[in-house]
Amino acid sequence: MKKFLVLFFAVTASVSAQDFDKKKIVRRLAKIMNENYVYPEKGKAMHDLIISKLKSNQYNSYDSESAFAAALETDLRSVTGDRHIRVTHDHAHAENIRNRDFGPGPESNGKFGFEEVKILPGNVGYLDLRGFMDIGIAEDVAKPAMDKLIQADALIFDLRKNGGGSPNMIRFISSYLFGDEKVHLNTFYWRPADRYSETWTDPELASQTKPDIPIYVLTSDYTFSAAEEFTYNLKNLERATIIGETTGGGAHPGGPSIISGDFVVNVPRGRAINPITKTNWEGVGVIPDIKVPAEKALEKAIELAKLELNK
């Protein structure tokens, strides 16, 4: 029995050491970023930086997986400033990726990101949206919510606790907010496929459209990614008043890749290109029309909505 235990622990240690092979992890990560990051020159710069640090033994001091992952993330971000880049060591996350099961998100409580849907006094619709879930998953919640809200005389979209999600939910919601003509919302460039994709509203998705209803979007410095796209789209189309704080500044969508073992990197493979500005909000965020602390944004929006409706 004693020999068995010694052998068991030896094998376990061997597997653990193999999973934490720094050379393998760095070389694989460098290759992933070089071949996939949306800007090739920055992908190469990240590759060169971490390979150089590996060769000069600068990663030798990291003896835990989580600390090593954090160091790699810091190094990659030092080149790009891209907050969509994330390096983690997480067994459950890695297994979900292998199984194409990305785990619980805003849908796990059955609300699919639609945290609160209500009509405020004065017939002002209010949506506290915590995530832009894929419409294919969330339609049974999203459609009744928007069908209810579009009956209001003004709308408030609260994105202060929204970290992003899917462009097709942006398209779905936006389709209620314009007229019968399709509106170009956004374009994405995807480096790995070297292709462009466009997002347009589709009036047929909405039970009713109200192109003139006053819209207010609430933001915070937590508002990120797809939540920023929704905000940026409506701002530049002059379709909404943005109230709150400058957003987080993430305009490079992508997805996770297994590096080795349970090490995972989120790789920004694309970039948003707004059809009006010809650029995006990466690194700068979306600047609100009316700057107030996030906690005061709802109060300000209600005030403005009442003034607008009482004209």
Task: Describe the residue ranges of each PLM region.
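Terminal peptide-recognition signature
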Residues: 29, 76, 127, 157, ...
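STAS-typified acidic loop motif
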Residues: 116-139, 276-277
